[in-house]
Regions:
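Flexible, glycine/charged-enriched surface loops at secondary-structure junctions
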Residues: 25-32, 214
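Short, well-structured alpha-helical segments in soluble
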Residues: 75-87
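Short beta-strand segments enriched in small/hydrophobic residues
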Residues: 31-39
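Positively charged, low-complexity intrinsically disordered leader regions
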Residues: 1-27
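Rossmann-fold NAD(P)-binding glycine/threonine-rich loop
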Residues: 104-121, 125, 228-281
């Protein structure tokens, strides 16, 4: 079974659009997301465009602020502080990666916790690990939504997450733990990785290496979630971190690239923007 993130996200966005349509009468306005793009990295431009299109579908106001790659760190932090104090702005997202002269950690810390739609602020991260209410990071949240939509029973399953980034690997391992899976986090220094992945009933791969996971690394009937977005060195086409063509016949459930986790990440960003809007109304 292939889980289409495109189809699931379209359904969820339609539901959100119906809800947001009632907001002007209820609250006087719709949620407002501000996206800051520094420089002209083609991948970043593409991601920002995707977020603007999704906002339009859902009915969220989207403002994209473009800044040159040579903007100073101080100028960028001052801009974020301005947006923090603007009551008409509900969500702030700074598209990563940033130029080397700007500290991503400082940028993330400067965004107000209440407007951190990415769920990257240290206080939101701490709340996640302490099982407190918080804004969940978009990709891990989208992965759990996809598993549930596909009817995958997470409780009691052996889950292996390859990748330990703060953006995907670590938070998705925590969300799987919260769903009562038994979770192992693997990484570049893991010994006997294939032996470990073959034990996985749920395998999440987020390492950014094209077709790294091969068919012999996956057990029959496994659920495979592919977070990677890469260029296939042979064809130049988009591909994931797993060899989809070889693994799809073995897997009980698998996500494609493109059209899998990516659309759900943007969908959950829309959800988080609405969530921040609602919390800030109280």
């Amino acid at each position: 079974m292939i889980i289409s993130g495109k189809e699931l996200s379209a359904k969820l966005k339609a539901e959100m659009a119906a809800r947001v349509a009632t907001f002007p009468e209820k609250y006087g306005r719709v949620p407002h997301l501000v996206v800051i793009l520094v420089g002209e990295d083609p991948a970043s431009v593409s991601y920002v465009t995707g977020k603007a299109k999704a906002s339009e579908v859902v009915g969220i106001k989207n403002t994209t602020i473009r800044k040159p790659a040579d903007i100073t760190e101080t100028e960028l932090l001052d801009l974020i502080r301005e947006l923090n104090s603007d009551d008409t702005v509900d969500g702030i997202l700074v598209q990563l990666p940033l130029p080397e002269h700007i500290s991503e950690a400082k940028v993330i810390e400067t965004i107000a916790k209440e407007k951190d739609v990415d769920g990257f602020h240290p206080l939101n991260v701490a709340a996640l690990w302490q099982k407190q209410e918080c804004v969940l990071p978009c990709t891990p949240k989208g992965i759990i939504r996809m598993l549930k939509a596909a009817g995958v029973e997470i409780k009691g399953k052996r889950a292996v997450v390859i990748g330990r980034s703060n953006i995907v690997g670590l938070p998705v391992s925590k969300l799987l733990l919260d769903e009562n899976a038994t979770v192992t986090v693997a990484h570049s220094r893991t010994a006997d990785l294939a032996e470990l992945t073959r034990q996985a009933e749920i395998l999440v791969v987020a390492i950014g290496r094209p077709k790294f996971v091969t068919a012999d690394m996956v057990s029959d009937g496994a659920v495979v979630i592919d977070v990677g977005v890469n260029r296939d060195p042979e064809t130049g086409k988009l591909c994931g971190d797993v060899d989809f063509a070889a693994i799809e016949p073995k897997a009980s459930v698998i996500t494609p690239v493109p059209g899998g986790v990516g659309p759900m990440t943007i969908c959950c960003l829309m959800e988080n923007t609405i969530e921040c809007f609602m919390k800030n109304r109280k």
